């Protein structure tokens, strides 16, 4: 099957197969913002399950800007002696383990952040404004400091034995906020034109590249729905993807819909969900036309048949799985065996209408 093929990334690193675990926040960090034995056990188990690439849950670059209470943080002044053990556990069986680096921007909850920071002082829309305080606009000096923090964290990841990093540019967090004309209304070099709004992610990538060298994988996660909601035209978002690919990005992960079972199949779904799914599919096809960089698609993949079909069509190079891998850690081995397996994962709901 296509799933068992290796993949060489632009930096020269090789993934042993076409399956990747997309980031899911573990929420298991210790009190001092460090990782611990729980991470080693979890990622060791996943590495035994056959997957080619493990992407960790989001690791923050500033202890004063957390997305969740139990995030791990990598910054100067925090010594995490467990990082090499976590990396070693995730590298078993020739598996790649990349750390997802993130800053939440305005999406740091009230109980964690009195005054979150963002490109502009624009609150989140109702009813989310009940959970998050109105942010303060970042100064230029703070923006430069954040770029340096991403680079420092990536260097620590490399020195600790992790085999790559992924910039979290999705789900409305800081990188995504800079890109969005809705959230970024600055009138300096960091906002306004698309070129200016792209400057932050571009500088983060270049700073990381400088700190880790040319042979260490750097990926980014983007969400098609972010672009849809963030006031982007599809053309603008394609420019972002194309630019990142040309800079030398090793893997672009795209989420934001369901690839394998689109809503067009007639399942009872809200109109907004149907539109999002359709957008996601065309989005992925348009990205593929424009970039040479390897693509990882995450969303709704449940069956070996659907995964192989997506790879065979050329739509993507890596299949991203998340919940199915959490519930069945051996799911990759089953898929790679050629068996016609299907994940039994059911959609999760929060009970909050505006989120579900």
Protein language model annotation of sequence segments:
Residues 1-356:
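Flavin-dependent oxidoreductase catalytic cores
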């Amino acid at each position: 099957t296509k799933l068992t093929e290796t993949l060489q990334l632009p930096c020269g690193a090789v993934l042993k197969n076409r399956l990747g675990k997309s980031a899911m926040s573990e929420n298991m960090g210790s009190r001092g913002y460090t990782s611990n034995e729980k991470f080693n056990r979890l990622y060791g188990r996943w590495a035994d399950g056959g997957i080619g690439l493990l992407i960790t849950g989001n690791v923050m670059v500033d202890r004063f800007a957390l997305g969740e209470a139990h995030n791990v943080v990598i910054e100067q002044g925090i010594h995490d002696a467990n990082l090499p053990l976590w990396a070693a556990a995730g590298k078993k069986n020739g598996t790649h383990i990349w750390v997802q680096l993130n800053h939440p921007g305005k999406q740091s909850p009230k109980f964690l952040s009195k005054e979150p920071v963002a490109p502009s002082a624009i609150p989140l829309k109702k009813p989310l404004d009940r959970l998050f305080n109105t942010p303060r606009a970042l100064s230029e000096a703070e923006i430069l400091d954040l770029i340096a923090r991403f680079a420092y964290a990536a260097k620590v990841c490399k020195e600790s034995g992790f085999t790559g990093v992924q910039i979290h540019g999705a789900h409305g967090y800081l990188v995504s906020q800079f890109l969005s004309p809705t959230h970024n209304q600055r009138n300096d070099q960091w906002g306004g034109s698309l070129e200016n709004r792209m400057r932050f992610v571009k500088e983060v990538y270049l700073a990381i590249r400088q700190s880790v060298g040319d042979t260490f994988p750097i990926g980014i996660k983007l969400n098609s729905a972010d672009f849809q909601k963030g006031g982007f035209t599809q053309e603008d978002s394609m420019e972002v993807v194309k630019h990142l690919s040309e800079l030398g990005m090793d893997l672009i992960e795209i989420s934001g819909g369901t690839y394998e079972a689109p809503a067009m199949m007639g399942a009872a779904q809200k109109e907004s969900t149907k539109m999002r799914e359709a957008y996601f599919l065309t989005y992925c096809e348009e990205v593929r036309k424009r970039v040479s960089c390897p693509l990882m698609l995450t969303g709704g993949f449940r069956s070996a048949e659907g995964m192989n079909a997506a790879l065979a069509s050329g739509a993507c190079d890596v299949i991203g799985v998340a919940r199915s891998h959490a519930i069945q850690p051996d799911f990759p081995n089953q898929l790679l065996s050629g068996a016609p397996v299907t994940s039994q994962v059911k959609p999760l709901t929060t009970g909050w209408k505006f989120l579900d």
